[in-house]
Amino acid sequence: MRTYEIMYIVRPNIEEDAKKALVERFNGILASEGSEVLEEKDWGKRRLAYEINDFKEGFYNIVRIKTDNNKSTDEFQRLAKINDDIIRYIVIREDQDK
């Protein structure tokens, strides 16, 4: 099984309830595609290194998953691209020797 780390930034002007629903939805997408969510961290609101879509801050979320295939990461990326609430994301495959 491969381990991935997914970091995504949610727009700063989102309501708290909407942010919680968004995080639950994307964690559910990962789990429904056969991934095991190992860890989830909410880093809170942080200043961006540079402006993204006229935003200078964003809510950072990090999720570590373990999966047999790429279906969950592919689906996450597909939906994150079309969701206006997520302003940036990155999916990183962790080394096997950990």
From Swiss-Prot:
One Gene Ontology term of the molecular function aspect: structural constituent of ribosome
Matching PROSITE patterns: RIBOSOMAL_S6
Transmembrane in keyword set: no
Alphabetized UniProt keyword annotations: Ribonucleoprotein, Ribosomal protein, RNA-binding, rRNA-binding
Gene3D superfamilies: 3.30.70.60
GO biological process: translation
This protein's name: Small ribosomal subunit protein bS6
Species: Staphylococcus epidermidis (strain ATCC 35984 / DSM 28319 / BCRC 17069 / CCUG 31568 / BM 3577 / RP62A)
